[in-house]
């Protein structure tokens, strides 16, 4: 980080606006993700584990209460993002098809 600061390349996502953010396997770990997304002007690219039900989450290998702050269903994530001013542009399960069980990727655009 010192090198980034020295060369004036450090970006603080909670303070400095940007056009796009890419968060692969990150969102579910952030208690304050709405604060970060408030500084993103155009695009949010996300990959998160998705669950069908609470029971499904509790039985999943992705159930990590010491690491994960959030457990999303597909509709739950889309609804939260909608409330934060985002619209779903694309969703894919390619990561799951490639062996990353229950991981889905999303592209959201700012409304």
Predicted features along the sequence, with ranges:
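Conserved SAM-binding loop
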Residues: 1-59, 66-97, 101-111
């Amino acid at each position: 980080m010192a090198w980034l600061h020295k060369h004036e390349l450090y970006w603080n996502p909670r303070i400095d606006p940007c056009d796009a953010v890419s968060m692969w396997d990150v969102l579910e770990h952030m208690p304050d993700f709405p604060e970060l997304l408030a500084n993103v002007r155009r695009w949010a690219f996300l990959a998160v584990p998705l669950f069908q039900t609470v029971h499904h989450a509790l039985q999943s290998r992705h159930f990590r209460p010491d690491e994960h702050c959030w457990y999303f269903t597909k509709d739950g994530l889309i609804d939260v993002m909608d409330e934060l001013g985002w619209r779903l542009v694309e969703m894919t399960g390619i990561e799951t098809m490639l062996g990353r069980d229950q991981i889905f990727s999303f592209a959201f655009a700012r409304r």
